[in-house]
Amino acid sequence: LKGKIVGTERPGSPVAYGTLVALRKLGLTPKDVQLRILGGSAQIVAALQTGQIVAGASSPPANFLLDRTGFHSMATTLDQPYQNVGLIVRRGRMDELAGRMVPLLRAVRAGIDRYYNDKAFTLKVIAKYTKENDPDFIDRTYEFYRKAGFRRDLMISEPGFQGILDFLAETMPETKKAAPAQFFDDRFVRQLNSAK
């Protein structure tokens, strides 16, 4: 891959993060390749199929199309900790919104539970929002995310958050001094979990 064009998404996106983590796993740095910002997985797939790039990160269901058309995975990032799902609220509004936070988090948890407990419904939702109509791709997408997992306890993954800080440190040196706990307040999640 050295010197070749690798497709990715906008900086800071999960795909861009995954691209850089995958490069690191392959013993490369962003300076070793030519990163081309293309858009989402659909654009990366199209660029691969037309030979505009030699590699790129993708996620389900797009990666299943790549598998079917003869492309092969060079690295997976599933073994790397990552903070995937989160709600963002300004610190100054936490107290003002306190009465709404636990019900909101309860609804998020209900959605996660529905994902795991109602596969037929979840497959319809995946098909609708990915605009995918191949039943095999839809089912494999469901299984991928079921295994990748959503934390039912909604707790922050400190190792996952630290991984993001480490990633950011390459371009923002001040994040080297930061600790994950500086960036989140999990009091409402803890309150929800203690009410079980």
Model-derived regions: residue spans:
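Short coil/loop linkers at secondary-structure junctions
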Residues: R24, T29, H72, E132-N133, ...
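Pocket-lining segment of extracytoplasmic ligand-binding domains
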Residues: A42-K131
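Conserved C-terminal helix/tail region of periplasmic/extracytoplasmic solute-binding proteins
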Residues: L165-K196
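A generic structural-conservation signal
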Residues: R10, D32, A57, A75, ...
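Secondary-structure end/capping motifs
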Residues: E96-K176
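Bilobed "Venus flytrap"/periplasmic-binding protein-like clamshell domains
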Residues: L1-R68, N84, E158-G163
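Residues that form or immediately flank small-molecule/cofactor binding pockets and catalytic motifs
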Residues: P11, G40, L78-D79, Q182-F188
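Proline- and acidic/polar-enriched loop/turn elements at helix boundaries
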Residues: L35, P60, L78, P180-A181
